[in-house]
Amino acid sequence: VLSPADKSNVKAAWDKVGGSAGDYGAEALERMFLSFPTTKTYFPHFDLSHGSAQVKGHGKKVGDALGNAVAHLDDLPGALSALSDLHAHKLRVDPVNFKLLSHCLLVTVACHHPNDFTPAVHASLDKFLANVSTVLVSKYR
């Protein structure tokens, strides 16, 4: 459960991401594909090269979904229900991949905002992304 301080940290960090959420999402995806090559198996139809339109497009979806989650911190299950259904029933993404992408998102935010990425912000974003991952895998059972 996110504390009031966590919620404040997440909102403040996401405000810094601002209109670049799609770019951060794409960068995190690229980082994930390079660091964890097995994740590429879910995107056999994508051009996974640096800067590809398909990775940018999916990065925008990731960024938009996270922005929606930040806007609904008190109701993540409601905000992410359709996405949970999609990943569990249609895409059948292995749940471990959400943890890998979360790690890559943390690294991406830290790289772009090193002075703002304090231990407290890091912990809050990590909790938030863990909560998002938990919601996304909730329909797997």
Swiss-Prot record:
Protein name as annotated: Hemoglobin subunit alpha
Residues modified as N6-succinyllysine: 7, 11, 16, 40
Residue intervals passing through the bilayer: none
Signal peptide residues on this chain, from the entry's feature table: none
List of residues that carry N6-acetyllysine: 16
This protein's UniProt keywords: Acetylation, Heme, Iron, Metal-binding, Oxygen transport, Phosphoprotein, Transport
Residue numbers carrying Phosphotyrosine: 24
Phosphothreonine modification, residue list: 108, 134
Presence of the UniProt keyword Chloroplast in the record: no
UniProt cross-references to PROSITE patterns, sorted A to Z: GLOBIN
UniProt source species: Chalinolobus morio
Globin domain: residues covered: 1-141
Phosphoserine modification, residue list: 3, 35, 49, 102, 124, 138
One Gene Ontology cellular component annotation held by this UniProt entry: blood microparticle
